[in-house]
Amino acid sequence: MDLLCSLTDGERQTGIERIYLDVKFLRRERESKTLTSGKFTPANALLILVDGENSGEVFRAPIDGYQGSTFKQLSINDNMNTDYMLQIINMHRQTLRENKVGSAIPHLNKKLFKAIEVPIPPYKEQQRIVKAINIAFKHLDTIMESL
């Protein structure tokens, strides 16, 4: 995983009013708050939760804003299909949640995150895998609705 993606902070900005991209806003549990300084996150950037109980959960920034304090920006190598990588991360989410570090506030175990082994099929195969996963989830949704 270490060679395929990176966890970074956005560039620090001041004097520009932007939405604060915290977990409650991204989950639509709260209205937006604005700040005049913070770590810039462009719209559509991926944010991974690195602090708290749900470490490893990934969000897509809906608009330009300032990165929440419990996030890192997740950058995926251009040679990898983003949805494929997100499926790999999601597949390991429970392991990441169960192996957090820190006592007072649990944190994403970045060493474990970087050590995730990722099969690297050709790009077209990554796309095919994502399509197959999406179809399987649609079938599961249909089954769940019929229960």
Language-model features: locations:
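Non-catalytic DNA-recognition/assembly elements of restriction-modification systems
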Residues: 1-10, 17-26, 119-147
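Short amphipathic alpha-helical signal-transduction/dimerization elements
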Residues: 90-93, 97
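A short beta-sheet element
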Residues: 24-29, 37-90
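Interdomain signal-transducing alpha-helices
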Residues: 85, 93, 126-129
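Short, solvent-exposed loop/turn positions at domain surfaces
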Residues: 34-35, 102
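A short glycine-rich beta-alpha junction/loop motif
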Residues: 65-72, 102-123
